[in-house]
Amino acid sequence: MEFIVLLTVCALLGLSCGQHGEYCHGWTDSYGIWRPGFQCPERYDPPEATFCCGSCGLKYCCSTVESRLDQGLCPNEEDLRDGVPSIELPPTVPTYFPFLLVGSIFVSFVILGSLVGLCCCKCLKPEDDTQVSGPAPIQSRLLDQDPSTDTSRHSSSSSASMPRPPIGARPQNLCSLGAENINLYMNMPPTFPMMGCPQNAQFMHPGTAGPSFMQPPFINYAVPAEHAIIMAPAPYIDARNCYGQTSNIYCQVPQQNDQTVCSGSPSKC
């Protein structure tokens, strides 16, 4: 009885051993898709397909020993993490990153250029203002000047440029001047008393060309200061007692001639 029970158990164990083959471990196919492992034979395999055959990228069950796959050469499931190979792959770069990098560089260049331009304008603007506003006071002073001040300044400068005799010096003797420097003649009588001058001498007033017409009150301007008192009537000089008759001195001012002639007929006492 016990012998029969042992034979039955052995038969059952043999049937179980013949139905289960090798175990094919999980793998990753050529598309990167993880394939889980399975037990040979599978559902649609024949019962004799107990060997794991194929390659590391594609596994299946077969019944021939020659086609059996050595799974020790393929990566084990321990080398894989959640169906992904443990080998670290380089991270993929997003497509928008190059455009973002180029745009940021362009914006930074624009901002930097604008800042440099503003700094240059601020540095150069004060120099331009000083150069433009420098001559403004001089121009305003030149524009504010009246023509009267200009004429007075011109006349004063011209008068200053003319030579003046020293203070206390006697005026130049008119008799010593030549006839080439005269343009105003005065015919004085031969008996007229004049110090340092011979008789029949002509007296003149040096200067530039005189006017074509001269009024009688300006005749004394041509006579030196020390001789003007002789021609001008004074209260302390009695011409009638000195010369015996009233001196009749007058000036002939012809309009057609530039020369003014003064004549008189005084007589000595």
From Swiss-Prot:
Question: What are the start and end residues of every segment in region (Disordered)?
Answer: 129-167
Q: Which of UniProt's keywords are assigned here? A: Developmental protein, Endoplasmic reticulum, Membrane, Signal, Transmembrane, Transmembrane helix
- Provide the leader sequence positions: 1-18
Ranges in the topological domain labelled Cytoplasmic: 120-269
UniProt xrefs under Pfam families: Shisa_N (PF13908)
| InterPro entries assigned to the protein according to its UniProt record, in alphabetical order | Shisa, Shisa_N
Task: Tell me which parts of the chain lie in the Extracellular compartment.
Answer: 19-98
**Keyword Endoplasmic reticulum listed:** yes
Please list every transmembrane segment annotated in the UniProt record, as residue ranges: 99-119
In UniProt terms, what function does this protein have? Required for head formation during gastrulation. Functions as an inhibitor for the caudalizing signals wnt and fgf, does not inhibit bmp, activin and nodal signaling in head formation process. Induces retention of fzd8 in the endoplasmic reticulum and inhibits trafficking of fzd8 to the cell surface.
Q: How does it assemble?
A: Interacts with immature forms of fzd8 and fgfr.
Family of the protein in this entry = Belongs to the shisa family.
Q: What else is known?
A: 'Shisa' was named after a sculpture form, common to southern Japan, with a large head similar to the Egyptian sphinx.
Name the UniProt record assigns to this protein: Protein shisa-1
Q: Which organism is it from?
A: Xenopus laevis (African clawed frog)
Name of the gene: shisa1
